[in-house]
């Protein structure tokens, strides 16, 4: 069975304390959208009830913008779901780094997450959140990730992974 996933990052700037990359895996192709809809219904019941375009525009699910009660409710809902999360992090030392160096770190964190996921899963379909200038790194990153899939296939048996790049703002 193919597991469907999404990779996104946080903290890529030098003044951020920690850079984090997460690969979230779902059992089904539409599980993320169903989960997003469930979270919206639970966290913003008035907006779902009125269901107007104006009401929906404020239903983004960014953790830092949620109240404590919304965070607890989201954790309760997510804790009951059959999802897996693979993460990697890098602690910034405060020194200024070039864009290329930050991108190397970002890439290594993605590779770490994928490597761990392929230890467990044989087939992955992964969307990667587009970062600035994503067209310039799409091909080399996909090539690096495909090399990891090949290495895991040689070591653990047949593995597949399909990669796509999607807007990070797209729900689900």
Give short role names for the model-derived ranges.
Residues 1-172:
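Phosphate-ester processing/binding pockets and catalytic centers
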């Amino acid at each position: 069975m193919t597991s469907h996933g999404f990779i996104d990052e946080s903290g890529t700037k030098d003044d951020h304390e920690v850079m984090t990359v997460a690969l979230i895996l779902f059992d089904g192709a539409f599980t993320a959208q169903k989960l997003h809809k469930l979270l919206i219904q639970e966290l913003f019941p008035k907006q779902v009830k009125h269901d107007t375009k104006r009401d929906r525009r404020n239903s983004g699910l960014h953790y830092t913008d949620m109240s404590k009660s919304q965070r607890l409710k989201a954790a309760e809902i997510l804790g009951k779901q059959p999802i897996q999360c693979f993460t990697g992090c890098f602690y910034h030392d405060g020194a200024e780094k070039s864009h290329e160096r930050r991108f190397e770190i970002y890439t290594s964190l993605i590779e770490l997450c994928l490597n761990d996921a392929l230890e467990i899963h044989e087939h992955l379909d992964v969307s990667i959140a587009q970062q600035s200038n994503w067209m310039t790194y799409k091909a080399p990153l996909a090539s690096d990730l495909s090399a990891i899939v090949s290495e895991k296939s040689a070591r653990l048996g047949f593995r597949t992974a399909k990669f796509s790049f999607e807007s990070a703002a797209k729900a689900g």
